[in-house]
Structure formats: C-alpha cells, structure tokens
Amino acid sequence: MEEDESTTPKKKSDSQLNLPPSMNRPTVSLESRINRLIDSNHYHSPSKPIYSDRFIPSRSGSNFALFDLASSSPNKKDGKEDGAGSYASLLKTALFGPVTPEKSDVVNGFSPSGNIFRFKTETQRSLNLYPPFDSDVVSGVSPSPVKSPRKILRSPYKVLDAPALQDDFYLNLVDWSAQNVLAVGLGNCVYLWNACSSKVTKLCDLGVDETVCSVGWALRGTHLAIGTSSGTVQIWDVLRCKNIRTMEGHRLRVGALAWSSSVLSSGSRDKSILQRDIRTQEDHVSKLKGHKSEICGLKWSSDNRELASGGNDNKLFVWNQHSTQPVLRFCEHAAAVKAIAWSPHHFGLLASGGGTADRCIRFWNTTTNTHLNCVDTNSQVCNLVWSKNVNELVSTHGYSQNQIIVWKYPTMSKLATLTGHSYRVLYLAVSPDGQTIVTGAGDETLRFWNVFPSPKSQSRESEIGALSFGRTTIR
C-alpha cells in the first residue's frame, strides 16, 4: 500500500537542517531553492557583468558586510552552537554568494567602496593571481628575456701564409684600412690583401739594405705610412702604388706609427716621437721626448686629443696635441709597454699591456689621472684592441699558450680563449665593420677570427632590451 508523501513523516537525513524548536522548519521547496541558489553562485561565469534594476540593487555586488545580518548575542556560552545563527549564515551564503566580504574586512579597508548597495555586479579579481613577492607585480614591468651568451668560434675562418713575417716584439707590421684592405710588412716588402676580392698586391720593395718595421693606414684608407729600419718614414698612395713622400728625422728604426687626421706620429728606437703634418713641407713639426728606451706602442685617442705612447722603459705616457713633454706618466708596468688601446665607449679610458715580466692589462682614467684596474693574464701581453660595436676588448699573448682572449669590460670576464698560433701573437688588427680580427705571429701565418657581433645586431638587441624594460600591461 502506497503512502501519501504529504501525510507520511519522512526520516531525518543528513542533508536537512537541524533547527531549534523556536524556529519554523523550512519546507522542502525552500531547501531546494537554497541549493539551486548555491549552485548558481558557484558555477556562474564572472566574465559577464550582471545588471539589476535601477531601483533594486544587485545582491551579489552590494556590501552587506557593512551591517550585521545575524548579530551574535554576547551572552552565548562558549562551545554551544547557535542554530539560528547557522541557518542565517547559510541563508546569507545562498542569497549573496560565498564571497561576501566580512565586516572586519570592510572596516580594515579591504572594500573598494563604502556604499552598501550597488546596481552593477563587478567582475571579481583574485588577489592571488601573482605570488606575493612577484617582481612583475612590484615593479609593474615585464622582466627582460635572459640573453644567451654569444657564441664565438674557436677556430679561424681563414688562414693566410705570411713568409718572412718577423718575430719581433717591438714592431707593428699589420694594419687594416677603412677600405677593407690589409697591409702586411714581410721582410723588405709590403703587401696589400683586399678582403672583398682576396686579391694580393705587392705595394713596394725597399731593397736588400732596408726592412719594413711598421705600417699604418691613414684614416680614409687611401694612403699608407711605412716605417723603415733606416729611420725614414714613407707615405704611399695605394691607388697609384706610388711613393709620394719620404720623411726623415729619426736616427734608428721606426717601429710604431699612429695617424690623427693629417698628423702622423712616429716612434723610434732613438727614444723620440716625431709629429709630422703631411700638409707642410717640414719633415716634422715637433719632437716629443720622455722615454728612456725604444718606442714600441703609439695610439691616438678617438677624439684625436691625446696620444698614448709605450716604451721598452716600462713607461706609459700621455701627450696632448701641443705638448712636447708628457702630461701624464704611468709607471706601474714591470715590462715593455707595446699593447695600447683607447676605449671608443668611454672618454679618457685607456688600456695597456705589459711584456713577459709584467703580464698585466691595466686600465687608466686619463681625465682624472687614476689607475682603475689591473688584470694578471699570466702571459706576455703583445697587443690590445677594443671593439667599436660592444664594450669588449681582445688581447693577444705570447708564452706559454700564444692565446687570444676576448674580454667583457668592465667585469673582465673571459668570453673566449682562441688558440692556434705556434708563436707569440705579436700583431693584431680589426676589420672596418668591427666584427673580424686578424692576428699575425712568428709562425708566419695570418689568422682571421669572427669575434664581435655586427653593429646592426647589437643595436637591435639594445632596442629589444629597451622595449622589454618599458613594457607594461595594456588594460
């Protein structure tokens, strides 16, 4: 016999509410409505704003925590559950959603508005979208992508034979022009190698009584200066392969040359430096004295205001355009100073390297006359050159590894160590685009290495870095 559901009492289930006698028991229909409301609050999409009537506020968007729906009695005994409070709490959750703020939160300032009623449901944004100490949240910018270290090939991409290339520490027999032509002094001859066409041209032959001791290109790459063992300096027009001038003044061999616009500086074993203006008829316009031994290194700064000279007396001097005495004297090196290089990135930054007894690369600030840093390379420093594309420099060395080292400045961390020469690497020059270096040694070879990035890639990386640093979230 079937019983009528309206008259037959139902068994108590765990899902029903346990209410005190003082309250009326909710009907099944009310309980089912509460469950439906809870489900709708749990699974509705927060992406769509819900609008209510202009006179009827939105329940889920209103701040009901500003007043108590169910204030608890202060005379309650600890440990006893108030059934009326539980039911009211459940009802509030069903009607207003599970994320209704508490009154304490509103008082403490967590509520964005002090209004109780709202007429639009705003999309809730979680406070835990980011870690509490996320750098992006703190700074408001996206971190720059981690830059992978640049790969430098450990082997030369080209090797040229250079017979009769002298193994003499005090000479400078290799230079690369702005026209992409390499000049090399081999014995008593000078050869030109065109990097674009790989064509080799014999520029001159000094004869059996003289040898080439130094070569140096003018800035435009149309004229080449040649220092000889007799003390003369010859100026050659490379387009016509013609000697247009021979200048005297030194008594001994000329092992170092440096151009500054129309002024040519020459350093000799006679311990002097001659300043020659090729626009005048005089062989030299001034004579610089200060070194006590052979001049083996000469370099003008990029702004042509200062001339650095290194000698076999272990001294590094700095001269200005008008002085006949050095304006700065650096005496920290313990061996001959041939390796000299001015930074193209920092005004007044000068690097120098010492010979076998010194083995150090030192950095100087010529504007403040200060010694900045010293790096022990553990081998003879034969030559130095800065990259014009990046803040890096290359050093070439002698005993015992005859290595070539690429350094990152100012950390002086080694980016690459290149080996291959069997004799000390005495000669070094950079291509006009700043990407390739050529090294020469007493093993009678010239080796070409790709060590520096191109100017375009470097500028592109700078742009990307700047854009990454300034990137913010678009709202």
Swiss-Prot record:
Lineage, uppermost ranks: Eukaryota, Viridiplantae, Streptophyta, Embryophyta, Tracheophyta
Listed PANTHER family: CELL DIVISION CYCLE 20 CDC20 FIZZY -RELATED, FIZZY-RELATED PROTEIN HOMOLOG
UniProt-listed Gene3D superfamilies: YVTN repeat-like/Quinoprotein amine dehydrogenase
Family designation: Belongs to the WD repeat CDC20/Fizzy family.
Role played: Activator protein that regulates the ubiquitin ligase activity and substrate specificity of the anaphase promoting complex/cyclosome (APC/C). Required for meristem organization and maintenance of quiescent center identity and stem cells.
SMART domains: WD40
WD repeats: 166-203, 207-246, 249-289, 290-329, 332-374, 376-417, 420-459
SUPFAM superfamilies associated with the record: WD40 repeat-like
Pathway info: Protein modification; protein ubiquitination
ATP-binding as UniProt keyword: no
One GO MF term attached to the UniProt entry: ubiquitin-protein transferase activator activity
Protein name (Swiss-Prot/TrEMBL): Protein FIZZY-RELATED 1
Summary of the tissues where the protein is detected: Expressed in the root tip, predominantly in the root cap, quiescent center cells, surrounding stem cells and columella.
Source organism: Arabidopsis thaliana (Mouse-ear cress)
More info: FZR2 controls the induction of early rounds of endoreduplication while the remaining rounds may be mediated by FZR1 and FZR3.
GO CC annotations, alphabetized: cytoplasm; nucleus
Positions with biased composition (Polar residues): 15-27
Keywords of the record: Cell cycle, Cell division, Mitosis, Nucleus, Repeat, Ubl conjugation pathway, WD repeat
Quaternary structure and partners: Associates with the APC/C complex. Interacts with CDC20-1, CDC20-2, CYCA1-1, CYCA1-2, CYCA3-4, CYCB1-1 and CYCB1-2. Binds to GIG1.
Location in or out of the cell: Nucleus
Region described as Disordered: 1-27
Gene deletion effect: Stunted plants. Impaired root growth and smaller root meristem.
